[in-house]
Amino acid sequence: MNKTLILALSALLGLAACSAERVSLFPSYKLKIIQGNELEPRAVAALRPGMTKDQVLLLLGSPILRDAFHTDRWDYTFNTSRNGIIKERSNLTVYFENGVLVRTEGDVLQNAAEALKDRQNTDKP
């Protein structure tokens, strides 16, 4: 009787460990993963056509992507994710012609303008 009871309890305990529902009840720590270049709103707002690559490099830092086939295009990307789910994503693409900045694209431009406007409103007495 004792051996049968111990064997049955061991089997139930082993099978209980296989339950996915029970495991999900216990929270686990998930790292917040930050990848890419987090660009300062003032630095993005300071970009002007006619700037050299060196000036842009000093202002924004090294780009995440420098395409070997499109050397006149730099991509700055920023992602924040937790548990494999992206919480925040922003992109900025900078285009050059003959080593001079000609245009920029990306959602960072609008976010930078809004952030600067908010800062100016909060700085006023």
Curated annotation (Swiss-Prot):
Localization of this protein: Cell outer membrane
Output the InterPro entries linked to this UniProt entry. Answer: BamE, BamE-like, BamE_dom
Q: How does it sit in the membrane?
A: Lipid-anchor
Q: Name one Pfam family in it.
A: BamE
Leader sequence segment: 1-17
Q: Is Membrane one of the keywords? A: yes
Q: Which GO terms describe its cellular component?
A: Bam protein complex
Lipid linkage positions (S-diacylglycerol cysteine): 18
Q: Where is the lipid attached (N-palmitoyl cysteine)?
A: 18
Classify the main location.
membrane
Q: Which GO terms describe its molecular function?
A: protein-macromolecule adaptor activity
GO BP, one example?
A: protein insertion into membrane
Q: Does the keyword Membrane apply?
A: yes
**Subunit organization:** Part of the Bam complex.
The free-text function statement in the UniProt record for this protein reads: Part of the outer membrane protein assembly complex, which is involved in assembly and insertion of beta-barrel proteins into the outer membrane.
* Membership in a protein family: Belongs to the BamE family.
Name of the featured protein: Outer membrane protein assembly factor BamE
What organism does the UniProt record list as the source?
Answer: Neisseria meningitidis serogroup B (strain ATCC BAA-335 / MC58)
Q: What is the lineage of its organism?
A: Bacteria, Pseudomonadati, Pseudomonadota, Betaproteobacteria, Neisseriales
